[in-house]
Amino acid sequence: MPRSQKNDNFIDKTFSIIADLIVKILPTNKESKEAFYYYKDGMAAQSEGEYAEALACYYQALKIEKDPMDKSFILYNIGLIQASNGQHARALEYYHESLKFNPNLVQALNNIAVIYHYYGNKLFEQSKLQEAKLMFDKASNYWRKAIKLAPYNYIEAQNWLKITGRITEDIML
């Protein structure tokens, strides 16, 4: 079942070896181990740009995985692939779904904000100013949530919030 590593990246190989050892010695059930192997294989495929293979692995992991936190990361990674393929609406669905399992998944909050900001820019370019404002407001809401959880990670988002007058005192550094 484990995917063979195509690249010669020392860190990736080391991670894979250590992860395999940990999974073997952890007192966990067979399904959790199987889900982890699919997830790990999905990450390896995703890092190599093999998105179809990665998605197949993630969907298998999702069928098996029971742990909400682990499900959130699987859904998040599916969202990353959808966004990479320009499927922003689908990416949003997966990011939102990941937040149902892990509301503090700061990366998903940020990526949702990025997509809403992108939509806002597109609408602004089309002179659809009211709709653009709604998208920018949505982006700011998600960035504020992300910044509250990780205040030093999203400096550009903080600057955008300041420049556009959307920053609130509870997130100012």
Curated annotation (Swiss-Prot):
UniProt GO cellular component terms: chloroplast thylakoid membrane
Keyword Cytoplasm: no
Topology in the lipid bilayer: Peripheral membrane protein
Known function: Essential for the assembly of the photosystem I (PSI) complex. May act as a chaperone-like factor to guide the assembly of the PSI subunits.
Highest taxon of source: Eukaryota
Sequence ranges of the TPR repeats: 35-68, 72-105, 120-153
InterPro entries tied to this protein: PSI_Ycf3_assembly, TPR-like_helical_dom_sf, TPR_rpt
Subcellular location per the Swiss-Prot or TrEMBL entry: Plastid, Chloroplast thylakoid membrane
Primary localization: plastid
One of the Pfam families matching this protein, by short name: TPR_1
Alphabetical keyword list: Chloroplast, Membrane, Photosynthesis, Plastid, Repeat, Thylakoid, TPR repeat
Gene3D superfamilies, per database record: Tetratricopeptide repeat domain
Matches recorded under PROSITE patterns: TPR (PS50005), TPR_REGION (PS50293)
Protein name, per record: Photosystem I assembly protein Ycf3
Family designation: Belongs to the Ycf3 family.
GO BP annotations, alphabetical order: photosynthesis
HAMAP family per the UniProt record, alphabetical: Ycf3
Organism of origin: Cyanidium caldarium
